[in-house]
Amino acid sequence: MKAKLNQFLHKPIAAPAALAILITLAYGILTPQMGFYWDDLPFAWILRFFGPAEFIEGFRPFRPMLGYIFAVTTTLFGGHPLTWQILGLLTRLLLGLQAWSLLRKVFPTRERSVLWVAFAFTLYPAYGQQWVAFTHINQELIPLIFLLFSFTITASLLRHKKTSLPLTALAIFLQTLGLFSTEYFFGLEILRFFFILIILTETAADKKEWFKKTTLTWLPYLIVWVINAAWTYSYHQSNAYNSYQISIFSLLNPLTLVNEFINTLSLSGFVVWLSTFKIFSVIDGSITQIIALVILLLASLTSYAAASNKEQETRYEENHATHYWFVLVGIITIFAGRLPSWAAGLPLKIEFDYDRFFVSIMLGASLFIIGLADWILKESRAKLVFLSLVIGMAAAYQFTVANTYRRDWENTQDLFWQISWRMPLLETGTTILTYEFPVQYLSDYQLMSALNWMYAPNFEGRELPYALQYLKTRFEAFEIKADQPINITYRTTTFTGNTSQSVVVYKEGNGCLRVLDPIYNNAETIPGASFYLVDAISLSNPGLILSNTPAPEMDKTLFGEESSHGWCYTYAKAEIARQAGNWEEVTKLYKEAQKAELSPSLPVEYLPFIEAFARTGDMDTAIKLTERTIKGQPTLCPALHTLWNRTTSDTDLSQAESLLQKECK
């Protein structure tokens, strides 16, 4: 068995197989349970209602060349979330193989180090957006594939000492596709210069000749790079452009530059690898942590086995030169990759969604960390063990990130099922306002596409029937008042509405969706909530909800199977019955929930049932639920006082008043 394994590990297929295993462990285990995230959702909506060609016009104000990539890929692969998740895995495998192939041509005597770089590049822990697949495959990863392929052709021509006009033209064409489709990789073209420089060190007679030949070889690509820089800058300054503005000149302060250098290098070169250890900072024995530990072991063993069987030059001179190049080129590439986001004034953080900027940094950061390991640990078993653990931790960390995406998609689907239960249909032109929904990887504009998908499954035209807005990001405090226009440009569509035609909703963590209003779900029922949300309650008009219509037909591809009819289903139906003044129905719903052994996650969800039992004469149950609510959340005492005062004409308040005076101090 051991002999067969060793025989396999020496075959050319061993390294690609190791990459495939690592990608599966880190990114692929939860693939069937993943969905759409961030801009995936509006892109899927555009594809569903307008078709692939719409991306060309949709990207014109942002990245005019990128729309063509979206148009081609969506024509070929459609818009199913599982398809894009699988394509994401294949794309990462292709990128890992490209990096490995390219670096083998540049550093042919450093097979082992090059493989470590490919592993680190593939699992780089700071880039946590693998599962935003629809967006990032098209927006960044395909352009990066073009650029790395272009580098590989250049390196291959130099290695074979060939001058081929067709291959050079192909390399320039791929460079053009990689640079002009997105600004993310603008700075990475400098890598080609250094790769040419490194390869030519082996044959150059003297430094002057070496540098001259390097420059001449790079010249055609340099011309394209300069043209790209001029085009990018001019387009960003034109009236056609509508996105981030270039602000590099305001950042050319010496102290700012030094601070950026230290922050970027420390964050991308060191902190990102140390951050992987936080998944075991607290040993809780959870299933996620156990699986992560298994992945750590399997990924470490896989990378150790694959790398230990690679032959590597061990002469000091060769090692020393390669360490120098790895570290130097790594540092330069880190800052070249940071340049576009830095020029736009965007921060570099290991958090969603700023971590997307690491996509142009991760190759340089991988060269840097492997170069340091080679330099410090030399060709020792300690280095093999150390780097195996680094790769294993990166794989385990990425799995834990994947699990947050899985949970978030479940929460998103559940959110829309709750919306459909509570608001089967809305008047056309309605805006849903909320402070923020408890989902991490989708914002209001992305969720707005799903809202229109749900309520307008046969949508045609350019005027959106519904909108969803986060108060925290779309409004200033003084704008939260009646009769304020709401005008939204959403890619190639628009929405025209008014704050007076709004429904204000609130969902707290694991709690149920609630429609806020000045009477039943007023400010007293959301203690501690943002003043943005409190001020918006007066705008909420539940009358815009068409409660007597059938629930919308939910696209199962997007929204999944209907969530179980648990407590939140009961609560949604209770709110509808309360809105209609049908108190008997509210009490009936509670009794059915009791039989099914359902209970709320939050005490505030007892309020409609307390009022219903009080108004229908079941004071014992009303008092019992009131006491339970106070004990669970004392800050609801003002809301309970108001609730019981509302029922004055229908009930005897003596018991309730006694309880409130005793418990609400």
Regions inferred by a protein language model and the residue ranges of each:
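Polytopic membrane enzymes that build or remodel cell-surface glycoconjugates and lipids
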Residues: 1-467
